[in-house]
Regions:
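Short beta-strand/loop element within the Bergerat-fold HATPase_c
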Residues: 119-129
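Acidic ATP/Mg2+-coordinating residue in the GHKL
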Residues: 137
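Glycine-rich ATP-binding loops of the HATPase_c
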Residues: 180-186
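Conserved catalytic submotifs in the C-terminal HATPase_c
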Residues: 59, 80-92, 190
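Short conserved segment of the HATPase_c
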Residues: 142-155
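Short acidic helix/loop segment immediately C-terminal to the autophosphorylated histidine
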Residues: 14-21
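Short helix-loop "hinge" at the ATP-lid/N-box region of the Bergerat-fold HATPase_c
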Residues: 111-115
């Protein structure tokens, strides 16, 4: 486990007189492991917070503005990533602002970290039935037979990198359910994966 690996590295540092280069390498492993554990705990906290959310917490959310901000923030977080927003009329739904933003952020992070994407496209289409939010990427994609399983907690696709908590898409699925909708992975016209979030119109 990550904690076991961290303990082993710390014991090596405590008991062996390593050359500077090896010492830096072990310290780097410790820092990377700590970062992974911290990300897992943070994701678990967000899952717990989501389970405590109620309909009373839902407010009007401008999806067009939310996607625009997510695009700009993602390009700051991931240098070299191109994120575009498909122009559309203002789209407002009733929902959880933080939860919807978390969904988009996690979809982008998943595309970059596990799919190696260099381009992401965000879009939202509104109708009487509700709204469809799509996050498309040009990454390596997710095999069709794994697209349902990767939404489960701690699940990892065969194309996923070794880093990560295995909770990113579980959080997406949770938020979709909290909004009475669904989340699914599809083929993207960009060549990678499309995360499609379908949210129903208010009753």
């Amino acid at each position: 486990t990550p904690l076991t690996a961290m303990r082993t590295n710390l014991e090596v540092l405590a008991t062996l007189d390593l050359p500077d280069e090896q010492r830096k390498e072990v310290l780097g492993d410790v820092i990377r492991t700590q970062t992974r554990i911290e990300a897992t705990l943070s994701a678990l906290e967000r899952l717990a917070q989501g389970e405590l959310s109620t309909e009373a917490d839902q407010v009007p959310v401008d999806i067009t503005e939310l996607l625009d901000r997510a695009a700009h923030d993602a390009m700051r977080v991931y240098p070299g990533l191109e994120v575009s927003l498909v122009p559309s009329p203002t789209c407002i739904i009733i929902g959880l602002p933080a939860g919807l933003r978390l969904t988009v952020d996690n979809a982008i992070a998943n595309a970059v970290k596990h799919g190696g994407a260099t381009r992401v496209q965000l879009s939202a289409v509104s109708s009487r039935a509700g709204v469809e939010i799509a996050v498309d990427d040009n990454g390596s994609g997710v095999p069709e037979d794994e697209r349902h399983a990767v939404f489960e907690r701690f699940a990892r696709g065969s194309t996923a990198s070794r880093s990560g908590s295995g909770l990113g898409l579980a959080l997406v699925a949770q938020q979709a359910e909290l909004h009475g909708g669904t989340a699914a992975l599809e083929d993207s016209p960009l060549g990678g994966t499309r995360l499609m979030l379908r949210l129903p119109a208010p009753r």
